A protein has these predicted regions:
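Glycine-/small-residue-enriched transmembrane alpha-helix faces in small-molecule transporters
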Residues: 1-38, 89, 149-176, 180-184
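Specific transmembrane alpha-helical segments of multi-pass solute transporters/efflux pumps
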Residues: 19, 23-24, 52-103, 136-140
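Hydrophobic alpha-helical segments, especially transmembrane helices
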Residues: 21, 29, 42-44, 72, ...
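Specific alpha-helical transmembrane segments that line the substrate/conduction pathway
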Residues: 38-49, 79, 87-126, 163
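Hydrophobic transmembrane alpha-helices of multi-pass small-molecule transport proteins
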Residues: 51, 73, 105-107, 112-113, ...
Length: 186
């Protein structure tokens, strides 16, 4: 199967990667002057403004069901509040580079959890190999020296890894519980 991406798709992909990757650096800088939870609050607040502007621009209506709003609140906790708090707190004791490498664990957890909870997603060795290749690429890009800085007694590393578990869990939970909701909303 040949997969083609337009120049616009490549540009958007690069922009997303730059935004996501730079978030670790910005967290590291902001931790010098702000409390971790203030950083999380500001990060989520800026994102909320952007999402609301997007919804207004696209004329996407918000759901009216209390059940859907409850599920969206749970998703917000699993996909944003917990991971953002864990990563920001974790970065008090680890570098941005190491945090970004550990963040790649989300793909590993995603493969495991989707094979466990989603009937249409069966475990396949090629997916695991893909995750390993992806994590290897991140290690090469960010720098092998960051791997050497891993300290099993450093709680920050475990907090970032736990955050990646919540990213993977939230994606699987949303696919099960919010499969009828517009992805722009969820």
């Amino acid at each position: 199967v040949e997969i083609y991406m337009s120049k616009k798709s490549w540009l958007l992909t690069l922009c997303m990667g730059a935004m996501w990757g730079s978030s670790f650096l910005f967290i590291e800088i902001l931790l010098k002057t702000l409390h971790p939870f203030m950083i999380v609050f500001l990060r989520a607040g800026v994102a909320l403004i952007g999402i609301l502007l997007f919804l207004v621009y696209k004329k996407i209506k918000l759901p009216t069901s209390k059940d859907v709003w409850l599920k969206l609140m749970i998703l917000g906790i699993l996909a944003n509040a917990l991971p953002f708090s864990l990563i920001t707190s974790g970065q008090e004791t680890i570098s941005a580079g190491l945090a970004s490498i550990l963040n790649a664990c989300a793909a590993f957890f995603g493969v495991i959890l989707s094979a466990t909870f989603l009937s249409e997603e069966k475990f396949a060795i090629n997916r695991l190999i893909g995750v390993i290749i992806g994590i290897s690429g991140i290690v090469i890009t960010i720098g092998y020296e960051n791997i050497l800085s891993i300290d099993i007694d450093n709680r920050g590393q475990y907090l970032v890894i736990l955050a990646t578990f919540f990213y993977a869990l939230s994606a699987n939970w949303a696919k099960i519980k919010l499969n009828t909701v517009d992805p722009a909303i969820s």
